[in-house]
Amino acid sequence: MATKAVCVLKGDGPVQGTIHFEAKGDKVVVTGSITGLTEGDHGFHVHQFGDNTQGCTSAGPHFNPLSKKHGGPKDEERHVGDLGNVKADKNGVAIVDIVDPLISLSGEYSIIGRTMVVHEKPDDLGRGGNEESTKTGNAGSCLACGVIGIAP
């Protein structure tokens, strides 16, 4: 059973980063940094597939094995892959430090082999008042992505 994972984020533009995942009890600690972003919030999600053959678009929708509506990371009604937003500073750097109780590195909610995505816009956490909000949080296009793999 994996206790650690890593993801290298890359895109067509300047956005890149490295994200680490570590199982700690019944939660997963997500840490790392992303550079090349515009200042402000950016949606941060685990997507269904580890397929990046057509860039980030082939990663499919948010990882949602429970068939729920999109929400924020602290909401009961959320996709497993809904990790909310990362916040970039004026230098375009986002420091990631998330503890999540729903994602896992093993079992039915495992994120291993799936794609981590950082989006162009803020995630409205399902509160945008339209249908797209309940699916994607209106987070816009993908800036960078990478497949989550087992780490030593």
Curated annotation (Swiss-Prot):
Pfam families: Sod_Cu. The keyword Cytoplasm applies. Its EC number is 1.15.1.1. GO terms for molecular function: copper ion binding; superoxide dismutase activity. Palmitoylation helps nuclear targeting and decreases catalytic activity. It comes from the Eukaryota. The modification N-acetylalanine is found at residue 2. It is found in: Cytoplasm; Nucleus. The modification N6-succinyllysine is found at residues 4, 10, 90, 121, 135. Disulfide bonds join 56-145. One of its GO terms (biological process) is removal of superoxide radicals. The modification N6-acetyllysine is found at residues 121, 135. It is an enzyme of class 1 (oxidoreductase). Keywords: Acetylation, Antioxidant, Copper, Cytoplasm, Disulfide bond, Lipoprotein, Metal-binding, Nucleus, Oxidoreductase, Palmitate, Phosphoprotein, Zinc. Residues 55-79 are annotated as: Disordered. Destroys radicals which are normally produced within the cells and which are toxic to biological systems. Homodimer; non-disulfide-linked. Heterodimer with SOD1. The heterodimer CCS:SOD1 interacts with SLC31A1; this heterotrimer is Cu(1+)-mediated and its maintenance is regulated through SOD1 activation. This is Superoxide dismutase [Cu-Zn]. It comes from Capra hircus.
